[in-house]
């Protein structure tokens, strides 16, 4: 006969107290109505501010509930930033960073070689990449591990030269306006 454990940990391997419970790391505990978006940027590139603006616009102008978490270095300028944005027709009860995103955006092409941005992408998710390379050229720029994840997870890949779009629209240097549209 099994009985409930009065004390336990989930999500870490607790080799000190041995109170860890196993769990399904691929399970998404949120409703499928929750949009979970993660934006990778560089400190002072405007990604965090643009994501905060998107959250405000969604929260004030739609019936959707919205939540944002922002991870960045205290030095801010030049460090990697990760913005986590959720929105849903139902109240959002999640009090943690997004672990399974159905939308991932990379505002800095240089991250392709430095970060595993697709780790958080769920199968079938959308990946939006700011790239100076065209859709025909970009595949060869990806590390093999990234190519494999795109294929295995059946991700939808969208490539935009946000710097060119912004410049053509008279918004030179404002890539985040393009990437958040």
Model-found features: residue ranges?
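Flexible inter-domain linker/hinge segments
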Residues: 1-36
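Active-site cofactor/cluster-binding pocket
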Residues: 33-43, 47-181
